[in-house]
Amino acid sequence: MSCQERLSQWETEVSTAFAHLSHPQIWGLVLWSAGIALSGSAGITQISALLAFVLCQGEQTVFQRLREWYLDADQKSGKKRRDLEVSTCFAPLLRWVVRLWQSDKRQLPLVLDATSLGNRWTILALSVVIRSCAIPVAGKVLPAQQPGSWRP
């Protein structure tokens, strides 16, 4: 099976899970997720180099496509550009994980994490744990000094 065929299969899987996203948003998610899985890195430079080789496309073209996927609509080139509302992906991602969950027990391990980024931000993340890997399914970024149950 060719790499294009595998990416097409993956695109079908991703578009089924995230049916509310536009085709360009789906394709960006396909490229990012496949690139991370294949390269073992979340760095845009490594991913764009690998995908450019695999897809026989220019590295700068792939880099720009990956970069514009996460930019705000007003920062993207071209017309009809949209923002990606990440929060709308949390419920579909959790549904997808639960659908693929293979366990004889009807338990799903969850982890709540509060990570501080210096004195500026606290990132709250709710994740599902699968095979020693935490998959974030919900999150919020807050000012670091804001009181809350994670920081009394």
Where are these regions (language model features)?
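Conserved, well-structured functional cores that handle cations and Mg-NTP chemistry
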Residues: 1-152
